[in-house]
Amino acid sequence: METKQTDLVIVGAGTAGMTAAIYAQRAGKQAVMLEALSYGGQIINAPDIENYPGMAHVSGFDFATALYEQAKELGAEFRFERALSIEEREGSKAVLTGKCTYLCSAVILATGAKNRPLGLEKEQQFIGAGISYCATCDGAFYRGKTVAVNGGGNTALEDAEYLAGLCEKVYLIHRRDAFRGDERDVEKLRQKPNVEFVLNATVTELLGENRISGIVVKDKNTQETREIQIDGLFIAIGQMPDNTAFSKWVTLDENGYICAGEDCCTGTAGIYTAGDCRTKTVRQLTTAAADGAVAARAACAEQS
């Protein structure tokens, strides 16, 4: 197995991770970024970003690509490998993947979060057969059809708006009577004749044999249930972190997020965290970028 020496290893290439790489390279440190999937994280699927200062309208893909190219131009190295564990070796941190061992002085964990499932029977079976977690990835398959979006945050609202431009009918299902996302986006959806809000309701059952054909939703107030016939279900009920591989080195809260304050310090020398994977009240592109800058500066200062 290959062994590589570097100053800093950043686990995760989302907004936080790539911002950390930019700041590290500008500080004269060599950063290696490890990403199991694609750069950009969850934002790469957003059709339009309106809440990042200085960028009134930009797609998630273009935003992520700009960060990626900026970090690369500054000399950051990207490797598409999954970080499996961290070890201590003769005063250095060793980050192990299936292909290489990276020796470094500091590690920034910017692993982000993954889509949260409903946890219903047949959910895994129907992935790719009517169930999706990415409207911009799979929405075109449902052009002219009837779909449902389950969720109440900005992602769900963005998904519903995007799908409303493709689909004959969009049901937007939320367990509360008010959405958590931006009110401006809610008002946009209210004006669309092919979008129907199903509030105070939860999806309790997935219908279909080889692919989804409908859902059962339960009204939280009346306890009554109804069947809704759909061709596709887009699940956008939030995210959950995946930090268990690093639990030896950092403290995780009850939900699996890395415990750290605004200084992005984990309490373990040489290990920092940034972005959606850490404990915080606001998870936005701006806060992820801020975390990346803070974590990188702290990691670089420790090496000075």
Task: Outline where the language-model segments fall.
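Short helix-loop-beta connector
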Residues: 2-5, 140-146
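A Rossmann-like FAD-binding core segment of flavoenzymes
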Residues: 4, 71-96, 101-102, 164-261, ...
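Glycine-rich, N-terminal phosphate-binding loop of Rossmann-like dinucleotide-binding domains
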Residues: 13, 111-112, 237-238
